[in-house]
Amino acid sequence: MGCFPCFGSGGKGEAKKGGGGRKDGGSADRRVARVGSDKSKSQGGLDSRKDAFIPRDANGQPIAAHTFTFRELAAATKNFRQDCLLGEGGFGRVYKGHLENGQAVAVKQLDRNGLQGNREFLVEVLMLSLLHHDNLVNLIGYCADGDQRLLVYEFMPLGSLEDHLHDIPPDKEPLDWNTRMKIAAGAAKGLEFLHDKANPPVIYRDFKSSNILLGEGYHPKLSDFGLAKLGPVGDKTHVSTRVMGTYGYCAPEYAMTGQLTVKSDVYSFGVVFLELITGRKAIDNTKPLGEQNLVAWARPLFKDRRKFPKMADPLLAGRFPMRGLYQALAVAAMCLQEQAATRPFIGDVVTALSYLASQTYDPNTPVQHSRSNASTPRARNRVGANFDQRRLHSPNHQQSPDLRKEGTTTSKYEAEVSRTNSGSGSGRRAGLDSMDVTGSQMGSPAHAGRKRESSRSTDRQRAVAEAKTWGENSRERKWPNARGSFDSTNE
């Protein structure tokens, strides 16, 4: 890559220099003008001149990341011993090491003949040196001695999300529902920072479960920025590039045309979120032919809410909130829409998942399957309704045939949203009474009536409280317009 266009900050604070801590919500104010002089060099063979691969800012000064010698990193990893090996892939190997100050680090040694070349090495150093957020992995430094290319990260003790979802040994406890929602919300915040805070926006392009690393308390951080691209600026709607990424996670429009947008990342996020919910791999060749692709398996199930409970990860053993499952699947389905324009922006996904993550579930509470919860229109989840109300007010959607097909549902949602945002109404008719009340079939009719009224009163109080939460969120955010419709949540 011969030229790296202007890369500025959407935040006010200036990033700390060196390999120190990262400041949430801020990014560097500097602009990067050049990372190399010859595109063919950066993509081709390795240059022995170290200076040719040191990223520099607009003033020609090396960027803030610490520069290590190969000797220092060899000592940190005990000369790259096998017992320090954390993992390996097409890019090379990752080792655990300890710096002279005792700090634990992860050292990624790039394979000189591997998939990640000099261009990807430079991009990753640049991105992680200039972007600072609590949900992005911290780059401590790098090494460009001779033909050696190494990256030094903070050590993430719990490994990757993939390690906790797939091929789990019998003696390992699977992730519970609360932790899964927490990881999803945190990863979405990292993606939101790249899309909305970085200026120009950054498209991650390789969002997958193996690139989400977990720290103490299962705190998620995005890693591996070698494929990241600067997003479109000005009047441009997309950037065109050769198709890169991982099969099973790539958005269909990007895979077919090479046209990349932030919505391409949203699709990839939907795949990972579906992995969290179902426990299935994005691509699993051990499954029957029709179930090998996770998204292809899930699409028909999205249209039948009665099948939603069967989509939950069997390792959860039923320990999840039924309503939370419906809401989570609605968010995943919206992210996975085939048309990029109809997917939500990641900021909207963050709002929805922050709500889901705040609704902690007691794993000792048995799952209650409501008869009407899976089949009646009243069982529509609130997260889906929240996205739908923004879509219904879109001028493009109001002119679409799908709007006419929805019929009375449209006016119902408009009335519900109006009452929700104004804080008026009983709460039950604000689209938030998704859990139907089943009266007691035992005892006298009067007794059954009292039980139903008491239960409905409790539901109303809960609905009003949650309506206020959604109302405040929607007022604080400018909801984007989306074109098209989402049939699976309208059925």
Curated annotation (Swiss-Prot):
GO terms for cellular component: plasma membrane. Phosphorylated at Ser-240, Thr-241 and Thr-246 by CERK1 in response to chitin elicitation. The active site is at D206. Residues 418-429 have a biased composition (Low complexity). It catalyses: L-seryl-[protein] + ATP = O-phospho-L-seryl-[protein] + ADP + H(+); L-threonyl-[protein] + ATP = O-phospho-L-threonyl-[protein] + ADP + H(+). Keywords: ATP-binding, Cell membrane, Immunity, Innate immunity, Kinase, Membrane, Nucleotide-binding, Phosphoprotein, Plant defense, Serine/threonine-protein kinase, Transferase. The modification Phosphoserine is found at S240. Its EC number is 2.7.11.1. Residues 80-356 form the Protein kinase domain. Residues 13-54, 402-417, 451-465 have a biased composition (Basic and acidic residues). It is an enzyme of class 2 (transferase). ATP binds at L86, G87, E88, G89, G90, F91, G92, R93, V94, K108. The modification Phosphothreonine is found at T241, T246. Residues 1-55, 361-380, 385-491 are annotated as: Disordered. Residues 361-378 have a biased composition (Polar residues). Its main location: membrane. It holds the Pfam family PK_Tyr_Ser-Thr. Changing S240A: Abolishes phosphorylation and activation by CERK1. PANTHER family: OS07G0668900 PROTEIN, RECEPTOR-LIKE CYTOPLASMIC KINASE 185. Interacts with CERK1. Functions as an immediate downstream signaling partner of CERK1 in the microbial peptidoglycans (PGNs) and fungal chitin signaling pathways that mediate innate immunity. Is required for chitin-induced activation of MPK3 and MPK6. Participates in the activation of defense genes during response to PGN and chitin. Belongs to the protein kinase superfamily. Ser/Thr protein kinase family. This is Receptor-like cytoplasmic kinase 185. It comes from Oryza sativa subsp. japonica (Rice). The lineage of its organism: Eukaryota, Viridiplantae, Streptophyta, Embryophyta, Tracheophyta.
